[in-house]
Amino acid sequence: MSKTRIYEVAKELGMNSKELMEFLEKELNISVKSHMSTIEEETVQVIMDLIEEERQTKKEVKKQKEPSKEKGKSSEQVKVKEKSKEEPVEEKFLREVTITSHDLSLDILAKQIGLEQNDIIKDMFMKGVVLRPGQKLDITMAENIAMNYNVILNFEIEKKETEEGKEQDIEAILAKKWNDIYEKEKDKLAPRPPVVTIMGHVDHGKTTLLDKIRNTHVADKEEGGITQSIGAYQIEYNGQKITFIDTPGHEAFTEMRARGAQVTDIVVLIIAADDGVMPQTIEAYNHAKSANVPIIVAINKIDKPNANVELTKQQMVSKLNLIPEDWGGDTITVLVSAKTGEGIDELLEMILLVSEMQEIRCIPDGKARAVIIESRVDKAMGPLGTVIVKDGILKVGDDFISGSTYGRVRRLINDKGESLIKAVPSTPVQVLGFNDVPNTHSILYVIDSKEEARTLAEKVKEKEEEKSKGPAKRHVKLEDIMQKMEEEEKKKLNILLKASTYGEIEALRNAIQKFENPEIDIEIIHAGIGPVSTSDIMLASASDAIVLGFRVKADSKALKMAEAEGIEVRRYNIIFDLIDDIKKALEGMLEPIQKEELTGNGVIKEEFKIKGVGKIAGVQVNEGYVQRDGGVRIYRNGGLIADVKIKSLKHYKDEVKSIEAPKECGIQFENFEDFTKGDELEFYKHVFVKRELGLEQKTK
């Protein structure tokens, strides 16, 4: 008989799994473990009939509650009786409640009208409406729910939004202000230097190429041969400036790369002539493509003996759909050698040419707007933010806001370590003067005064805190009420993450999220910058988490506490090692896969009937072996007649675990005796294989 999963039945009934499970236990005394449990088709039909009957009964009861005339009683007596029996009808629309927010959820509505959220859920369920704790409500739904409790909702939202909306959406207003300036003063816009990002596969020569342009040597000093954080540099070529953003090379740093592309005007996609188009090449191309950024391809390592430029171009066409100009396409392709410097000048010329074609413009003066591409805390200088100025002039002494942080520019430092008085558009500078570490990817806006900046930043922070608190509270309710059974089934890995910069945090978070799996919940309970501290260990202990540090130290007190508490602390300098360890940990948590393995074959030579035991097959093992806890497929004239388990395996009179070819044995099959001499046997066993998890396994 066929079976159906709980969640499928719930979906058909317009319920959620938790509600159906409660109904089964209460009404039918059927206990199921989870939403993935199965029930017989017969039971499904019974459930559907019961719920439909219950819903129908509720409708009839509602109809019967209509006021009716009663004979032999005075009108006054009738009214008194009706009032006592049908009080909700008599008091309908007697109470009004004012709502002042669009952000209305079921728990908030329940509080506003003076009821328990669970009572509303039960009442509405009996009316055929399924609600969930903390569920978001639109105006119509909220009004319908309230009407069931004789409540009218008065929505006074427009006025509130007019008065408070501006304060709540500070960043949107600042962004709109700049967009309006662009629209109104197009004739005043001026050219600015292009911001270029070099992208590509790991070890294809990005850092070496950038170093050749800047005449520096960074790559040899870096651990693991890859860039460890985002940097921005500016060079001058033929009297024109070009700003470069150097992004990490490993594919795990997709978030860093995406952030780099967002502030980028031009992407240089680097491909090694001796390696061709690789996975990270495709990934980098997709980021540039989604950002709608023009792409210049630099085919690097042309100095190597095994360089194959033509094959690389073929792969550009087949894997990226980029057709080089010399092949009749429109993709500018430059042959370079980051090692010898060949082709570098041509690459810079092409960058300036594309920049001219793109007509990259900015507001050349006035208050500045800049993009934060990196942030960190320096022991001596405090919170720092690396920015690229997009518009206006950023000056020492300027007051600014950046998300929920604010400050006054105390110092500007360029990529050469020089202090500047001001920074013009496309200039990368490090800004000192933040009150706290700013979020990477946020926008810095210069404001009239520090007081105004502080006020605006505090309002942004309040809004962020409200957002973080709201969903968190509802999440706890959902877990407590609806998802407990899922948590009992799923395994969970809690991680506390520490790194040296926010850029690394974002990139590592992105890499870890790629390992999400239906069987395992991965939760980063905390992510911060700086050394691993005692407070981190305390949090990890309370949350049963592992502590992962990337390019950070750990306090000696923290390490002692971790040892005492039994908390695992691992620190890494190379991203590959960290990701590999997480992958191994998750693979160890996955249930192994059961696979079938053929062990041998044989033929039935004789049949024996033993009183009180049953029919036994006398078997000749031809190849391999047969084992007692294995299975057997029985074939007759080439066709499969049975697939059975082995009940007993004997060699002469002895019960044995296995028999190898070319020995003979006696086999009793489990619940099967319809065999005969000449039947062919195929022996197999089930083995458990450890599962592997790849970066590509993304389920959400």
UniProtKB/Swiss-Prot annotation:
Region (Disordered): 58-85
GO CC field: cytosol
One Pfam family it belongs to: EF-G_D2
Subcellular location per the Swiss-Prot or TrEMBL entry: Cytoplasm
Residue ranges of every copy of the tr-type G domain listed in the record: 191-365
Residues covered by region (G5): 337-339
InterPro entries referenced in this protein's UniProt entry, alphabetically: EF-G-like_DII, IF2_II, IF2_N, P-loop_NTPase, Small_GTP-bd, T_Tr_GTP-bd_dom, TF_IF2_bacterial-like, TIF_IF2
Keyword Cytoplasm carried by entry: yes
Main location: cytoplasm
Chain spans, region G2: 225-229
GO molecular function, one term: GTPase activity
Homology family: Belongs to the TRAFAC class translation factor GTPase superfamily. Classic translation factor GTPase family. IF-2 subfamily.
Protein name: Translation initiation factor IF-2
Organism of this sequence: Petrotoga mobilis (strain DSM 10674 / SJ95)
